[in-house]
Amino acid sequence: MVSLLTMPMSGGIKTWPQAQIDLGFRPIKRQPKVIKCTVQIDVTELTKKRQLFTPRTTATPPQHNPLRLNIFQKAAAIAIDAAERALISHEQDSPLPKTADPRVQIAGNYSPVPESSVRRNLTVEGTIPDCIDGVYIRNGANPMFEPTAGHHLFDGDGMVHAVKITNGSASYACRFTKTERLVQEKRLGRPVFPKAIGELHGHSGIARLMLFYARGLCGLINNQNGVGVANAGLVYFNNRLLAMSEDDLPYQLKITQTGDLQTVGRYDFDGQLKSAMIAHPKLDPVTKELHALSYDVVKKPYLKYFRFSPDGVKSPELEIPLETPTMIHDFAITENFVVIPDQQVVFKLGEMISGKSPVVFDGEKVSRLGIMPKDATEASQIIWVNSPETFCFHLWNAWESPETEEIVVIGSCMSPADSIFNERDESLRSVLSEIRINLRTRKTTRRSLLVNEDVNLEIGMVNRNRLGRKTRFAFLAIAYPWPKVSGFAKVDLCTGEMKKYIYGGEKYGGEPFFLPGNSGNGEENEDDGYIFCHVHDEETKTSELQIINAVNLKLEATIKLPSRVPYGFHGTFVDSNELVDQL
């Protein structure tokens, strides 16, 4: 999505560490109300619980280094700033939906924290397995500045949390990914880019786009080097650690010998990548190729596919014809094919004219799945199969079943499909499902994989050494009470049997990350490995990293972290050999 500048209210801008001391959200002057949502937070109570937003440490406020402006630019800046102040004042008279209200979206342990330099010799309860040697890193959204208007959880600046483990000891650090937008905002000392989901809706969203383009034309900002936040995915590929969000190119990070994090910069694969890349590229464990998609919400082609050889050489882009720009957050690969979801959550920028969100559920569109050879050169090679009621924000795996002429896809089917982005009366459901695509009849079937269980399973993974091949186990977060995660489930995809690991008490977490053990590469020992989970205790306000044996779900070790770790998104593990080979 495109971005725009935002202006402060009078009285100055505060960075998050300053603003969290005073979070009644004074810039958002709305009447207290109870927001009808699954989170069930009374907004009048949030101002009484200011400690939920207060970090345990403080950060140094960003330095304010204003640009050198000519007379024309100064006049333009004054006029645009005045228009933005008027816009913000107007917005304060209108209620925000829960999906864009920062008092809901970044309350409690969803609120941001400052950076932390390396903290060594952390307390470890239990014993860290000897085979674990490297760095577990996890990405997440962490807004540097207090929102001046709407804000969605996905809008926050990218922050990566790193736990380095060596010889049974652990260290911790967390750092912002220094994206182009964050660097500009930090230099100016205030937010100047918009929130793609929280702010770009309705007439005010159109106004923000106009202000954004005006600032760019006047040279008040540089919007030519990307507007992404790099807050979602992580992948280690071709000796590079990449942080990603689907609104921009990846950003290359580097883990130092001490376990700290550095931003190398926006990475275009040595000039080969010209467009954004989604946050869930697929690394084939056998061929070592990286497969990716890129979607555009404004102009055709709305979707493109490409892949990178193990040494980072990009294939020609294959344009995939779609009738409307579609949100494609994830996809899947098999040994020989790519599975492309063309689903019902689409972008209709014209909806902003009627005061609505441009991210909409199109009930008239029929969802479908595209099966395409990995080495396809023409869109005519794609087999499209209709697949109603199969909206999956994430696909966990897929494989080929030659005996039945089918492609088997494992994903969590969500309904209502757009409930993450738009306010809905229905409660969200995320059902772990098996979708079978018959390549001969060109029909699909879907069934729930759980036996006599009604539980929301979302963020998670399978053994990545088996990606694209038949897998037996999936490790998925138990999203209860939504949107919190009270534990994770180990699901047998063959039998539907589910075993739960619950954090207990007021402890909640996020993605269960599976790290294969010494023998966790083959089909027989697929679950040999360990689960990493960042866990936060909402009663004691402390965070920890739990390491659980994936075979028997027994807790092996708990690493006590020196500061709060907000609930976040996706992670990966960089082993000691990969650390040495980093570029």
Curated annotation (Swiss-Prot):
It catalyses: a 9-cis-epoxycarotenoid + O2 = a 12'-apo-carotenal + 2-cis,4-trans-xanthoxin; 9-cis-violaxanthin + O2 = (3S,5R,6S)-5,6-epoxy-3-hydroxy-5,6-dihydro-12'-apo-beta-caroten-12'-al + 2-cis,4-trans-xanthoxin; 9'-cis-neoxanthin + O2 = (3S,5R,6R)-3,5-dihydroxy-6,7-didehydro-5,6-dihydro-12'-apo-beta-caroten-12'-al + 2-cis,4-trans-xanthoxin. It is an enzyme of class 1 (oxidoreductase). Its cofactor is Fe(2+). This is 9-cis-epoxycarotenoid dioxygenase NCED2, chloroplastic. Induction: Low induction by drought stress. GO terms for cellular component: chloroplast stroma; chloroplast thylakoid membrane. Very low in all tissues. Expressed at the point of organ attachment and the abscission zones in the plant. GO terms for biological process: abscisic acid biosynthetic process. Its main location: plastid. Has a 11,12(11',12') 9-cis epoxycarotenoid cleavage activity. Catalyzes the first step of abscisic-acid biosynthesis from carotenoids. It comes from the Eukaryota. Keywords: Abscisic acid biosynthesis, Chloroplast, Dioxygenase, Iron, Metal-binding, Oxidoreductase, Plastid, Transit peptide. The gene is NCED2. One of its GO terms (molecular function) is 9-cis-epoxycarotenoid dioxygenase activity. Belongs to the carotenoid oxygenase family. Fe cation binds at residues 280, 329, 394, 570. Signal peptide: none annotated. InterPro entries: Carotenoid_Oase (IPR004294). It is found in: Plastid, Chloroplast stroma. It comes from Arabidopsis thaliana.
